[in-house]
Amino acid sequence: MQASPLSTEESVLLEQGRMDFDNGRYWHAHEAWEDLWNSLKRRNAEMSEILLVQGLIQTAALLYNHQRKKSRGV
C-alpha cells in the first residue's frame, strides 16, 4: 500500500512536529501532529496513515509527561 501525498499544509505540520520533537518540545510536536491527524481524518486518508500519526501524537504526549515527571496521562 502506498501512502497518499500530503498537502503542502500537511507537510508543514509534519515537519514542524518533527523539529519540535527533535528539540524536546514534545507538547508543540503533539499539537502540530494533532492538526495533521485531524486533516488526514477530514480527507478520509488511509487508516494506516491516520494511525501512524496517532502513534506520533501518543509518543509525544508520553515524553511530555515524562519530561514533567507526571505519572498519569494528559
Where are the language model's segments positioned?
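Short coil/turn linking the two alpha-helices of tandem helical-hairpin repeats
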Residues: N44, Q67-K69
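Inward-facing hydrophobic residues that define packing positions of alpha-helical scaffold repeats
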Residues: F21, Y26, W33-E34
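Short, charge-rich amphipathic alpha-helical segments embedded
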Residues: E31-I57
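Residue-level signature for tetratricopeptide repeat
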Residues: M19, I57, Y64-N65
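Acidic/polar-rich alpha-helix caps and helix-coil junctions
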Residues: M47-S48, R72-V74
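TPR-repeat structural position
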Residues: Y26-W27, S71-R72
